[in-house]
């Protein structure tokens, strides 16, 4: 015997649900990794991607960083040179060119660097920001060229050079051509130093691998955001190698500050003011010749070719 249909639950209720259904955006809420607290996405975005209450610093896009730093959120994009897209014809599970296409569609950027020129606290400044969303901010030929172009812009305009580092390291799909960018960027930093221009590095979460082993640790001043992972090899790799449990907070910004690897841990909301003050002081000092210092070189040393 077939039971009579419950028309209220099977007919009326679904229609009511359909009538009053509201589309909920997938990114309406953001969950705090520390506390599990759910916060409106818009509220977190307006707070520069810092969770209110817990003060957990989430990852931030390169464009958002430039907007946060430059006065009135406006700047001039520094044109970046083009490089060969796939010099080694590399393929793993996917072709490298396909990975690049996906990353460009996802971020709207040609590669993992964005360079801007503008004013910060009325002081002219050149800022480079790495985009972790683009293949984990990995350093390849395009990234190396971008960093060097940023340094050249700072040299040309006589401004401080500020870097927001966020990277998983060298880009394996470019092999030795990626590793070549480590000495190239180091030479660019030397040119800034020879010209007596400040180079400030802000270490964000995460800054690892070949980036840590090169330009991210060559600043005149090293700032870090709270809780940022800063290392060459990650804690999981080290634990598997030495078969020991690492101390709590190992390789985090606060740990490195205690051990002299970082000068200051700065909340994201205070970064603009801190960097503006530091660069202002350093530019004033470096305009005044110090006794016993060598004169500025008139011809900077050339950079090696990218490939």
Curated annotation (Swiss-Prot):
Q: Mind telling me which GO cellular component terms the entry cites?
A: acetate CoA-transferase complex
Q: Where is the composition biased (Pro residues)?
A: 292-307
Give the first-level EC class, as a single word: transferase
Which biological processes are named by the entry's GO terms? fatty acid biosynthetic process; malonyl-CoA biosynthetic process
Entry's Gene Ontology molecular function annotations: acetyl-CoA carboxylase activity; ATP binding; carboxyl- or carbamoyltransferase activity
Q: Where found in the cell? A: Cytoplasm
What EC designation does it have?
2.1.3.15
Instruction: Extract the Gene3D superfamilies matched here.
Output: 2-enoyl-CoA Hydratase, Chain A, domain 1
Q: In which pathway does it act?
A: Lipid metabolism; malonyl-CoA biosynthesis; malonyl-CoA from acetyl-CoA: step 1/1
Question: Where is the stretch described as Disordered?
Answer: 286-307
**Segments forming domain CoA carboxyltransferase N-terminal:** 28-297
Pfam families associated with the record? Carboxyl_trans (PF01039)
Query: In terms of one coarse class, where is the protein primarily found?
Result: cytoplasm
Classification via InterPro entries: AcCoA_carboxyl_beta, Acetyl_CoA_COase_Trfase_b_su, ClpP/crotonase-like_dom_sf, COA_CT_N
Show the catalytic activity: N(6)-carboxybiotinyl-L-lysyl-[protein] + acetyl-CoA = N(6)-biotinyl-L-lysyl-[protein] + malonyl-CoA
> What does this protein's UniProt record list under function?
Component of the acetyl coenzyme A carboxylase (ACC) complex. Biotin carboxylase (BC) catalyzes the carboxylation of biotin on its carrier protein (BCCP) and then the CO(2) group is transferred by the transcarboxylase to acetyl-CoA to form malonyl-CoA.
The entry assigns this protein to a family as follows: Belongs to the AccD/PCCB family.
Q: What is this protein called?
A: Acetyl-coenzyme A carboxylase carboxyl transferase subunit beta
Source organism per UniProt: Methylorubrum extorquens (strain CM4 / NCIMB 13688)
